[in-house]
Amino acid sequence: MPTLIQPYDPHWKTEFEQLKQVLSNELNDFEIDIQHVGSTAIPGLCAKPVLDVDIILHNKSMLEQLTVILERIGYVSKGEQGIEGRFAFRQRAVFTPITSTQQQWQAHHLYVCF
């Protein structure tokens, strides 16, 4: 079933901030920036209700270690998918990233970039 474009929802920003906090806590040993990108990041813009989240990894040699942690919290690595320097991860379930609260998360695309 196709994902339909919806009016802007301010909850998208809140959901991103919560995701960012969880990811920051899990990845605190890495030099990273986490950014909300794409149409859901632009206030007032209609969008598909799927967040786009970029993790900018400053040390490319740490990708394998970072991937292990992302997989541990429920993400599945999908590789570069034809875009060199950008690695895609998908949620294994609506509870990804896995936390002690078993929170159900907004659908999102997660990318690790250099």
Describe every region a protein language model picked out.
Residues M1-K48, I56-F114:
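Catalytic core of pol beta-like nucleotidyltransferases
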